[in-house]
Amino acid sequence: MHQGSPTQIAEAVSKGNADFAIATEALHLYDDLVMLPCYHWNRSIVVTPDHPLAAKQSVSIEELAQYPLVTYTFGFTGRSELDTAFNRAGLTPRIVFTATDADVIKTYVRLGLGVGVIASMAVDPVSDPDLVKLDADGVFSHSTTKIGFRRSTFLRSYMYDFIQRFAPHLTRDVVDAAVALRSNEDIEAMFKDIKLPQK
């Protein structure tokens, strides 16, 4: 198991140096990879309890634009969707710090360096009781995490098992049907009516 940027892990799989790439960004750049959608996720806004946004039920993109932001480095963990949301609103985010890891971002928020924008699943009420999590579903569109592997890969039983443990809807039959399709656009069409898990 190796962590890297989406481009690094997709490249590793494309070259045969890894079996799978699991990412939200950049996998579409590799036509030689079969990409299967695993789950949808969105972001949350995290602040300290004394922050002016902490008392709000929901936050608009206009309100968010008024504060310094701490979020993921571009190319990691759905960062492009954050940029798209601000561009769509005609706003420029004030990003003061970036990191590849949600725990680092939460530390910056705790230090008062900015408002955090991270994956919702990265905020845990047990380990993060000192942070206030605000829903950002109305601010950002969801992202989809995918698992990718080389189209030429002979999938062994343990590989099918790994895929299905990671994404239970990706049974052996579903994976085989997707692999038989000609392109990732066809795979996207195959999954358009399948309700993916939300994390």
Residue ranges and their predicted role:
Residues D32-R43, V47-L69:
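Flexible hinge/capping segments at coil-to-helix
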Residues V13-I22, R43, L91, V109-G116:
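Alpha-to-beta junction loops
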Residues S5, S60, T100-D101, A119:
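Short loop/turn segments at beta->alpha junctions
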Residues M1, N87-V96:
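A local structural motif
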Residues Y30-N42, D103-S152, D161:
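Beta-alpha-beta core module
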Residues T24, A54, P68-A89, L155-Q164, ...:
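Secondary-structure junction motif
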Residues M1-L29, T98-A99:
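Central regulatory/effector-binding core of bacterial HTH transcription factors
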